[in-house]
């Protein structure tokens, strides 16, 4: 298990740290202990390696703290990424036997609050910070529901039922609505308005689409539209407010998709497992702008920063600069 720091301008490796795990759990499917994405506050970087736990480094590669979490992981391992919110480091820790939503102190890794999950707990979704307009909430798909939690205490505020075990996509939000999708059976996507308490399944769901439109990738909300992607390269664009399907197209790159779409400069970027990058206009009418091949297996979601898009394949890290 490795943590590597690169110079964003040159690609030079600045430092590399090995995390020596006594045991690396076997995982099924396409998962691995290094699936979760690191997160940074600009001073430190926080990484999660499944059953090994959390590790924090400063930007010079010095270990600040580590937090064992041996109870995390299940048949398919862990895939949830850590998230920062104020002084909190949030993590969805689930397993076949049990699990919890953890809020740790960014400075020390110590627990600030810990909310146990009800059975069945297995979930691969990452916590999502939702600004409702009346305050922020932590949203997570777990235990057959999408749930909202108080970030100060971890107390459950509301829930929407009907979600299966093992959901992978992370929620998204825009225009005052929250979007949550299921990639298992039953497969669907819902839009939820804020303000509810308790079970709001019948009161706060604004629209619902009952056909499967996502696989592993999370939905993307941008420019008044919601984009969803499933295996086979089938992409769906919704009107984010009404749920109307504006278009559904099969991209030139078929096959499986694990990376979530990202947006920048009015475009949506999607990457197939085979490393085919499709660039789509973030518009109410389908527009295929370009298709490029990395020629390498790609599971990680792209990242956009400083006018560049960073793509991690199984073999390499690429930085692609936009036109000036």
Where are the regions a protein language model picked out?
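Noncatalytic, solvent-exposed loop/strand surfaces
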Residues: 1-324
């Amino acid at each position: 298990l490795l943590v590597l720091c690169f110079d964003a301008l040159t690609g030079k490796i600045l430092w590399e740290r090995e995390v020596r795990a006594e045991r690396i759990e076997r995982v099924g499917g396409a998962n691995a202990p290094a699936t979760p994405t690191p997160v940074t506050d600009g001073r430190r970087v926080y990484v999660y390696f499944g059953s090994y736990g959390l590790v924090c480094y400063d930007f010079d590669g010095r270990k600040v703290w580590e937090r064992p979490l041996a109870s995390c992981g299940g048949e398919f391992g862990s895939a949830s990424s850590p998230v920062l919110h104020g002084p909190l480091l949030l993590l969805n820790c689930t397993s076949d036997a049990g699990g919890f939503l953890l809020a740790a102190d960014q400075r020390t890794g110590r627990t600030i609050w810990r909310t146990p999950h009800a059975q069945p707990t297995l979930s691969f979704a990452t916590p999502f910070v939702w600004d409702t307009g009346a305050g922020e909430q932590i949203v997570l798909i777990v235990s057959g529901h999408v749930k909202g939690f108080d970030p100060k205490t971890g107390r459950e505020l509301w829930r929407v039922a009907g979600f299966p075990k093992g959901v992978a996509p992370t929620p998204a939000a825009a225009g005052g609505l929250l979007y949550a999708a299921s990639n298992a059976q039953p497969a669907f996507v819902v839009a939820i308005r804020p303000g509810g308490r308790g079970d709001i399944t019948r009161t706060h769901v604004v629209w619902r689409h009952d056909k499967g439109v996502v696989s592993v990738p999370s939905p993307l909300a941008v420019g008044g539209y919601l984009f969803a992607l499933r295996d086979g390269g089938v992409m769906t664009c919704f009107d984010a407010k009404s749920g109307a399907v504006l278009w559904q197209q099969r991209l030139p790159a078929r096959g499986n998709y694990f990376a979530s779409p990202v947006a920048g400069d009015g475009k949506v970027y999607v990457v197939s497992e085979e490393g085919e990058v499709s660039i789509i206009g973030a518009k109410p009418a389908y527009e295929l702008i370009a298709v490029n091949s990395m020629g390498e297996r790609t599971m990680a979601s792209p990242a956009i920063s400083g006018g560049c898009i960073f793509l991690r394949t199984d073999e390499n890290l690429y930085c692609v600069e936009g036109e000036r």
